[in-house]
């Protein structure tokens, strides 16, 4: 099972809000997921990023691959260098 840490789009049209989730790479973007580890709101100034660092580190240690966007968010929060 190829596990990814990626963004799940929520919110209304033109008002995106994202959940940072751990999901099998074969599932659709907004489909089933294994665990929610945080949220990301790009509409606030500055962008609001809330990520459970312990859960994120656990999944990264277990081999989950973050997408490019999530990797940038994890660097901002300080989970990865």
From Swiss-Prot:
Gene3D superfamilies tied to this protein: 3.30.1320.10
Gene Ontology BP annotations: translation
Molecular function GO terms recorded: structural constituent of ribosome
The keyword Ribonucleoprotein appears for this protein: yes
Keyword Iron on entry: no
InterPro entries with a match to the protein in the record: Ribosomal_bS16, Ribosomal_bS16_CS, Ribosomal_bS16_dom_sf
Alphabetic keyword roster: Ribonucleoprotein, Ribosomal protein
GO CC annotations on file: cytoplasm; small ribosomal subunit
Source species, domain of life: Bacteria
Protein family: Belongs to the bacterial ribosomal protein bS16 family.
Listed NCBIfam families: S16
Name of the protein: Small ribosomal subunit protein bS16
Protein's gene: rpsP
């Amino acid at each position: 099972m190829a596990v990814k840490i990626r963004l799940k789009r929520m919110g209304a049209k033109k008002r995106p809000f994202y959940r940072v989730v751990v999901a099998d790479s074969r599932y659709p973007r907004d489909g089933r997921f294994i665990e929610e580890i945080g949220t990301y709101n790009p509409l606030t100034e500055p962008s609001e990023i809330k990520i459970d660092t312990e859960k994120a580190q656990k999944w990264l240690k277990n081999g989950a691959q973050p997408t490019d966007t999530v990797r940038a968010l994890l660097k901002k929060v300080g989970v990865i260098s």
